[in-house]
């Protein structure tokens, strides 16, 4: 295989800008798929990816294309996830390429996620060229979008390809540009093997399948390979390429992209970003850029029906096989029974995992409010990381608390700026800058505490801007904050599943909203139920659910007041006794209400 005829590229685009459809057109045009095999969004293998129109795992496909100069080229398309939670996966997929297509919707212009991924690509010196998609739409305005790309991203866009993936316009021009503009890979096939592992997933028959991009050396079937970060070694049982279905080959040489099946049992052993080398002839240094991905958002998952606990455990273990960035530990709650504390990269990641559990494994789950990782500095000087309110020590042992901050880039149309600024201020944000990108698009940059974002920030941002805003964020650092733990008590008993860690300024309002919401949801009992929100020993809000009572005076017509009083006193005594022994069943909705309180 002549290395000068190879091209490795990826497609960078915001959600819904037509990336997967464009990939379909490229597959069709180069004859990788016949009309019969063609299905929309071929590369998005999971139903959920297809349904939400997002790419979650990276996929690769090898296309052969005869260019106008008469030569045959091999093009490796590496499809990247386009969502903010999966930034690390994107950066590894991009590191496996020499160039990228920047796909921008000709009617919507540049969005926040596009920017984040383009900057990742430009940071590692990829050759990026723009493609304007959806030019068949009546609202398409290529002139404006070209100007936007040049002003915001700073790459030359005057000769951008105009295309419509849906109609198949411009596919040939895109392939020609890939051949002309993207440089061939560099690499020495005789050097020791150095390959980047940029994705892995679990197959129930063959174990873990890893995707690699070979930078130096050659990987043959039967070689013993070593993964440098985990120091584990395996035998390469099969090597090959996706064209777009799996095709086995004898070897993969420098510059090529392909898969390796090596009998690896768990995805945790094949970490994304790791360097693959040969055991008997290892390379001198690993490829740079590897990092351990740490969960940032935590939430408790409990089965509604306790019988499903075992099923939930098996389901989580299966998902973990495929997704090493997700973590789970068993935990118990007095109110909810047995469940798991799960860690996710971000909100979208959390939603996807929950949906997959409910859809693929048929589980009914209840989810506690998401929290982030706080740092507790104790009086003794030790620092402890906590991810749920129940782990927080008593206040007298705590010197101060720190919470994680993020830097958010929000793109909005001009008319919504006021509403978005008000939302960010309400969420304790610190304004960095406001940039007018064009006459009607604004980029707002804010520093925000992560725990304000995990609850409902994204939903509220979308509703304020009628769905036009796009958000991208990166993690900054930990900062000292006045955080407290708020407990919810029912008849004096603390309900552990409802405890929250939040900022002292917000505790009073949040507590008041919470107890009034709970009052609506808890059914009336035969005795009165007190619902209280407390910080330490101080009660900050209270509501009472009145008792149901029988009319004990119904049978007294007229008669003496003392007789009536005796009956009422007797009833009161009974209610008191009942309150001591009675316990309140909390309905399922009560926990969901916590998530919904604005």
Swiss-Prot record:
Keyword vocabulary terms for this entry: Cell inner membrane, Cell membrane, GTP-binding, Hydrolase, Membrane, Nucleotide-binding, Protein biosynthesis
Topological type in the membrane: Peripheral membrane protein
Gene Ontology annotations for the cellular component aspect, listed alphabetically: plasma membrane
EC number: 3.6.5.n1
Keyword hit for Cell wall biogenesis/degradation: no
Domain tr-type G: 4-186
InterPro entries for the chain: EF-4, EFG_III/V, EFG_V-like, EFTu-like_2, G_TR_CS, LepA_C_sf, LepA_CTD, LepA_IV
The family this protein is said to belong to: Belongs to the TRAFAC class translation factor GTPase superfamily. Classic translation factor GTPase family. LepA subfamily.
Protein name from the UniProt record: Elongation factor 4
Classification of source organism: Bacteria, Pseudomonadati, Thermodesulfobacteriota, Desulfuromonadia, Desulfuromonadales
């Amino acid at each position: 295989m002549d290395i000068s005829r190879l091209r490795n590229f990826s497609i960078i685009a915001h959600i819904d800008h037509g990336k997967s459809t464009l990939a379909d057109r490229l597959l069709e045009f180069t004859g990788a798929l016949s009309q019969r095999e063609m299905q929309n969004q071929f590369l998005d293998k999971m139903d959920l990816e297809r349904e939400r129109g997002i790419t979650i795992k990276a996929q690769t496909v090898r296309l052969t294309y005869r260019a106008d100069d008469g030569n045959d080229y091999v093009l490796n398309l590496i499809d990247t996830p386009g969502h903010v939670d999966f930034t690390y996966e994107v950066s590894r997929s991009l590191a496996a390429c020499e160039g990228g297509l920047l796909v921008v919707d000709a009617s919507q212009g540049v969005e926040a996620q596009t920017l984040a991924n383009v900057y990742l690509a430009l940071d590692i010196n990829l050759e990026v060229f723009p493609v304007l998609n959806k030019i068949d739409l009546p609202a398409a305005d290529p002139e404006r979008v070209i100007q936007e790309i040049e002003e915001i991203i700073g790459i030359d866009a005057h000769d951008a390809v105009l295309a419509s993936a849906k109609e198949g316009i411009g596919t040939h021009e895109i392939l020609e540009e890939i051949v002309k503009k993207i440089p061939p890979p560099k690499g020495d096939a005789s050097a020791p093997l150095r390959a980047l592992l940029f994705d892995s997933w679990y197959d129930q028959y063959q174990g873990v399948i890893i995707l690699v991009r070979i930078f130096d050396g050659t990987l043959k079937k039967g070689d013993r390979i070593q993964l440098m970060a985990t120091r584990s070694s395996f035998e390469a049982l099969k090597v090959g390429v996706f064209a777009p279905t799996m095709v086995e080959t004898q070897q993969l040489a420098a510059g090529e992209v392909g898969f390796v099946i090596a009998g690896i049992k768990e995805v945790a052993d094949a970490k994304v970003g790791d360097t693959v080398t040969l055991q008997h002839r290892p390379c001198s240094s690993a490829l740079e850029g590897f990092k351990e991905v740490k969960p940032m958002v935590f939430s408790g998952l409990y089965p509604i029906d306790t019988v499903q606990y075992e099923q939930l455990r098996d389901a989580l273990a299966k998902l973990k096989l495929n997704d090493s960035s997700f973590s789970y530990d068993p935990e118990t709650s007095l109110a909810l029974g047995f469940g798991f504390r799960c860690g996710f990269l971000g909100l979208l990641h959390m939603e996807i995992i929950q949906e997959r559990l409910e859809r693929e494994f048929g589980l009914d789950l209840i989810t506690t409010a998401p929290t982030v990782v706080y740092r507790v500095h104790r009086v003794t000087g030790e620092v402890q990381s906590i991810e749920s309110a129940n782990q927080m020590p008593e206040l007298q042992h705590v010197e101060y608390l720190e919470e994680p901050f993020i830097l958010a880039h929000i793109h909005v149309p001009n008319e919504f700026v006021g509403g978005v600024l008000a939302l960010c201020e309400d969420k304790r944000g610190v304004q960095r800058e406001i940039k007018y990108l064009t006459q009607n698009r604004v980029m707002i940059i804010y520093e925000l505490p992560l725990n304000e974002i995990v609850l409902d920030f994204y939903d509220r941002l979308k509703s304020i801007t009628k769905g036009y805003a796009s958000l991208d964020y990166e993690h900054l650092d930990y900062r000292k904050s006045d955080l407290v733990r708020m407990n919810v008590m029912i008849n004096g008993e603390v309900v552990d599943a409802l405890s929250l860690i939040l900022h002292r300024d917000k505790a009073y309002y949040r507590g008041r909203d919470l107890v009034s919401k709970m009052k609506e949801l808890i059914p009336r009992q035969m005795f009165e139920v007190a619902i209280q929100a407390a910080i330490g020993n101080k009660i900050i809000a209270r509501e009472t659910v009145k008792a149901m009572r029988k009319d004990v005076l119904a049978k007294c017509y007229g008669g003496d007041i003392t007789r009536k009083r005796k009956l009422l006193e007797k009833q009161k005594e009974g209610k008191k006794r009942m309150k001591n022994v009675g316990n309140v069943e909390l309905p399922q909705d009560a926990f969901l209400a916590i998530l919904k309180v604005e």
